Design a protein with these regions (language model features):
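Generic structural signal for small/hydrophobic residues in well-ordered secondary structure
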Residues: 8-9, 23, 45, 82, ...
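Active-site neighborhoods of divalent-metal-dependent phosphate/nucleic-acid chemistry enzymes
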Residues: 3, 70-113
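Short, well-structured N-terminal submotif of metal-dependent ribonuclease cores
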Residues: 1-37, 49-64
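Generic alpha-helical structural context detector
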Residues: 14, 47, 80-84
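A generic structural signal for alpha->beta connector loops
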Residues: 32-34, 68, 111
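Nucleotide phosphate-binding site architecture
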Residues: 12-13, 43-46, 72
């Protein structure tokens, strides 16, 4: 399947909270099959749900999102892209969190926005 969008953890979290009307309207316009999230983002969201104890309402929101958004597996090609990306950015003095770099590598390796 060819995806157009890879939702970052923060975007999915905002969708789950339901407070941003403009974001919700834009997301509703995305066709099923156009959007995905990295398994790294899914792991971050699961961690947050379990850590903060608001799991019931937010977990239900995440399950609703999962009806429209696929979770993409971390593959060998994504891992190779991650290594190259981190190395190149480090040479330029740019350091981001490991999770952010992993999600960026996922998007780059699959040519997704």
């Amino acid at each position: 399947m060819t995806y157009k969008y890879l939702f970052d953890t923060n975007i999915v979290s905002h969708i789950m909270q339901g407070n941003d009307e403009k974001l919700l309207k834009n997301i509703a316009a995305v066709t099923v099959g156009q959007a995905a999230m990295s398994s790294v983002s899914f792991a971050e969201l699961e961690y947050g749900l379990n850590k903060f104890g608001k799991a019931d309402a937010l977990r239900q929101a995440l399950q609703s999102i999962m009806l429209r958004v696929d979770v993409l597996p971390w593959t060998q090609s994504v891992a190779a892209c991650y290594g190259e990306l981190c190395s190149n950015l480090e040479k330029k003095g740019i350091n981001l969190s490991n999770f952010d770099m992993m999600i960026a590598a996922h998007a780059i390796s699959m040519d997704i926005i």
